[in-house]
Amino acid sequence: MALLVEKTSSGREYKVKDMSQADFGRLELELAEVEMPGLMACRTEFGPSQPFKGARITGSLHMTIQTAVLIETLTALGAEVRWCSCNIFSTQDHAAAAIARDSAAVFAWKGETLQEYWWCTERALDWGPGGGPDLIVDDGGDATLLIHEGVKAEEIFEKTGQVPDPTSTDNPEFQIVLSIIKEGLQVDPKKYHKMKERLVGVSEETTTGVKRLYQMQQNGTLLFPAINVNDSVTKSKFDNLYGCRHSLPDGLMRATDVMIAGKVAVICGYGDVGKGCAAAMKTAGARVIVTEIDPICALQALMEGLQVLTLEDVVSEADIFVTTTGNKDIIMVDHMRKMKNNAIVCNIGHFDNEIDMLGLETYPGVKRITIKPQTDRWVFPETKAGIIVLAEGRLMNLGCATGHPSFVMSCSFTNQVIAQLELWNEKASGKYEKKVYVLPKHLDEKVALLHLGKLGARLTKLSKDQSDYVSIPIEGPYKPPHYRY
């Protein structure tokens, strides 16, 4: 696709695959709104006061129908928005078209190359001569990463005149990042510094992105305040758990049509995502084996009736392998060589480095056969046996299906709206330093409360005597911050 920014009749910038899908996107968006009570409640509560009036928000988060409802919630509260996806395969093109036509600048399409992906990220951050965004909604931390790497390169350039060298790294994706920054230095050597100075803060959606933020906080390089949305209970214990329980089998069946019952499924990692995946596979009739480094998580898996072994113990016996760790080098090419014919290998953690895709792609004599988009069979020359890799090792639930359903994403995205409001409303108060924060318990409980009515729930209320007895306010919060749920 030619990397040229287009404009709507109203002058809004965009780059999507097919604007003719906008009507279809709008229909699905309207269906999703009914399933997203938290976001709709935010529009009702905050819309009249327009709290985001004057705010520029950049989003780097899967451009799905559910995200479209989030974007239109931000614009309904007064924000101006520019958006890109955080994954080359996760965009739903009809959702991107609907938003680009009706609501916000979007730069996203399904099946981007890495070069296109980072071009889209750069466009979403580009607000013209006035600098960058005021706020970032991030998923995985790529938008945050680009600004931090850009600032670092500009400081080196100012001191030494040295520009980034893309050949200094073996990572093909980071080579692209360095090339983008290098080109930017020639146009404006203070581009990313201007972004940093304007930025009020970022709210981060995922475990992987949160890890990056805490690493930067620890080494003193975090450039602006950050709110860790992932560790809100109404995100991690719902989106990560129940969302993956829903979307893993959906992606597997759409990609392969394989029968899960009777198969041996290996879930690498037993955190919230791994727990949801293991539950889905067990319910579908698979025999589930978990790999873990953490003895507490391992014991939890055992108490659920699952086996806990190493990958090496089961690599030649299992039928389905799912990585959920957020770490790298979980399934290596040497593991894949030992797998049975047509074993399915997929990732639902975050980045594609959980599975050794580079090692697979460069394995001598390996043959790649594309069955359909995001479903590839890789045949090893010495055995003539093949494995099926989904979504090129990236998020299979978004690459091979449509991700998590609207209701559970409403919980996550309501947290995002609240986090963005918190950062924006406190921008002049000094409340938030260059650190990582978590939303307070009363806001977590508010997000849950907004979703109960949709499911027909009625809460019991504490009496005054009961409240005094347990030292819990009648209106909450009901649990201390350290409570684990």
Curated annotation (Swiss-Prot):
Essential protein during embryogenesis. Adenosylhomocysteine is a competitive inhibitor of S-adenosyl-L-methionine-dependent methyl transferase reactions; therefore adenosylhomocysteinase may play a key role in the control of methylations via regulation of the intracellular concentration of adenosylhomocysteine. Required for DNA methylation-dependent gene silencing. One of its GO terms (molecular function) is adenosylhomocysteinase activity. InterPro entries: Adenosylhomocyst_ase-like_sf, Adenosylhomocysteinase-like, Ado_hCys_hydrolase_NAD-bd, NAD(P)-bd_dom_sf, S-Ado-L-homoCys_hydrolase_CS. GO terms for cellular component: cytosol; plant-type vacuole; plasma membrane; plasmodesma; vacuole. It catalyses: S-adenosyl-L-homocysteine + H2O = L-homocysteine + adenosine. NAD(+) binds at residues 206-208, 271-276, 292, 348-350, 397, 404, 479-483. Pathway: Amino-acid biosynthesis; L-homocysteine biosynthesis; L-homocysteine from S-adenosyl-L-homocysteine: step 1/1. One of its GO terms (biological process) is one-carbon metabolic process. CDD domains: SAHH (cd00401). It comes from Arabidopsis thaliana. Its cofactor is NAD(+). Homotetramer. Belongs to the adenosylhomocysteinase family. Gene3D superfamilies: Adenosylhomocysteinase-like, NAD(P)-binding Rossmann-like Domain. This is Adenosylhomocysteinase 1. The lineage of its organism: Eukaryota, Viridiplantae, Streptophyta, Embryophyta, Tracheophyta.
